[in-house]
Amino acid sequence: MVTIIRNADVYAPEHLGRTDVLLLGGTIAAVGENLKADFGGAVKVTELDGSELILTPGLIDGHEHIMGGGGEGGFHTRTPEASLTDLTLNGITTVVGCIGTDGVARHMESLLAKAKGLEEEGITTYVYTGSYQVPVHTLTGSMMKDIMMLDNVIGAGEIAISDHRSSQPSFEEFARIAADARVGGMLSGKAGVVNVHLGDSPRMMDLILRVVRETEIPYSQFLPTHVNRNEALFCQAIQFALEGGTIDMTGNEDIDYWETICDEVRVSTGIRRLLDAGVSDDNFTISSDGQGSLPIFNAKGEYQGIGIGKASSLLKEVRECVQRENIPLEIAIKPVTSNPARILKLSSKGRIQPGMDGDLCLLRKDDLTIHTVIAKGQIMVRDGKPLVYGTFEKRG
């Protein structure tokens, strides 16, 4: 399987300008002008014309409920699984699955099985061990053992704090989770990060900050998510990032509506504020929370209604960064490509350079929508339409 993308405007994520990219199997073999691959006709060479397109790394969604989530409004509010094309049609070639509120009917066995299924269908998958609950629900009985011995497991999450749905973990419990995740990661060469769900409580990131300040565990051990869920939390997140921490913003396809009922910070606005505050463009990511529930609670914590996160929010947020905030594309795509790859130690992901995995997106120049998606060297989407479907997805 040999593919050459000709004369695309390449963002690696750095802007390389117009050039060619050669894929051999599932790997990027070369980046440069006028590349050739002549096998005397023994191997089929597919050429894609990128002259009117932008080429970026495949998107990395670092927080998605791939097997579904939710349930805060009862059994009928359990959200559905992600299908393959839910991801690929939105440029996502690598996804990190997690479990949220429901750590009873959703469990690690099912999460890993779903991840492996998506992997067999053509994309790359990882998972966090655990859920909102503490003690952490694991597969092997040990969080450290899950991270060290299970290939797909790269950290713990999403552990909930500052939320009425959390287990209200003590400082000691939370510090132990971070310590065990850290050692599990060290022993296996993985990130071992703790993906921390942040709720609306005014305690915000207090537990994380206590661990960093009162123990030997560094900022890099944590990836707090949903930091844009309200204004006060986002202000604290800016300071956290200025001090060297990394933060994750949650995309929202329906932000125009949510801005009318709460003070959630629009991702593109948040990124502009981070940059203006002097935060490094290496220190933040965007994830979709796809297939996760978006429950609405009143001031008493009573359930009022529910929505669902969408994988499509990832690329939508990149577009808004460019189109609403005039953020250069080479910066706007870092939170969904090279940044999560570095933070999560996905060493072959997130960049366009020789030796990296053949995960690529071709975007239309005028509106940054999906034209072609390639995962591990295989063309999954072309002309905005899927070529590869999930096992039980309806064709056409």
Where are the regions that the model predicts?
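Active-site gating loops and adjacent loop-to-helix segments of metal-dependent hydrolytic enzymes
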Residues: 70, 74-77, 81-97, 146-167, ...
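Divalent metal-dependent hydrolysis catalytic cores, especially in the metallo-beta-lactamase
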Residues: 82-135, 151-164, 186-201, 220-225
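C-terminal cap of metal-dependent C-N hydrolases
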Residues: 25-28, 352-396
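Active-site core of metal-dependent hydrolases
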Residues: 179-295, 303-304
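Divalent metal-coordination and catalytic microenvironments
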Residues: 8, 26, 52, 63, ...
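Metal-associated gating/positioning segment near the N- to mid-region
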Residues: 42-45, 50-113
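His/Asp/Glu-enriched, well-ordered alpha-helical/loop segment
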Residues: 276-362
